[in-house]
Amino acid sequence: MTTTNKTIILITGAFVSHSIWHNWEIYFREKGFTVLVPPWPHKDAPVAELRNSLPNNPSFASMRLADVIAHYENIVTSLPEKPIVIGHSLGGLIVQILVNRGLVSAGIALHSVPPKGIFSFEWSFVKAIMKPLGLLPFGKKTY
């Protein structure tokens, strides 16, 4: 696939800060791309500050997936060209939704959350989601 697009948007998952994309941002900028790494709504702060505030932040706690999707949809539609989007985990699901809606030129989902209705029974997947979903007795901590 050939694309002349020169803008990349990096979308993080739910449990990390957008700062995790720093090395990717540098890499793609050195290759001549314009790189945007917009944080999720209510997550634009240093990691230490987020760790202290998010478990009790009512704005973040009341946010729904539709709000996050709308946030990124507004970003991609405000650009002069359709960007390439790369997302990890829940960010990968957001990428799939943006691709499905025809809002981006290309999308790459890294270790993506699967779309609704698709579930893997592979032990590695089941084990990975049990703790964040609070399905295990020792999984009651916030992330």
Residue ranges and their predicted role:
Residues 103-140:
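Flexible "cap/lid" loop of the alpha/beta hydrolase fold
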Residues 10-14, 89, 112:
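Glycine-rich His-Gly loop
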Residues 86-91, 95:
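Gly/Ala-rich beta-loop-alpha elbow adjacent to hydrolase catalytic centers
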Residues 23, 97-98:
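Active-site signature of alpha/beta-hydrolase-fold catalytic machinery across serine-
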Residues 42-62:
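N-terminal beta-loop-helix "entrance" segment that forms/cooperates
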Residues 55-78:
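Alpha/beta-hydrolase active-site loop
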Residues 2-3, 77-82:
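Glycine-rich phosphate-binding loop signature in dinucleotide/nucleotide-binding domains
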Residues 3-49:
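Short, surface-exposed "cap/lid" segments of acyl-processing enzymes
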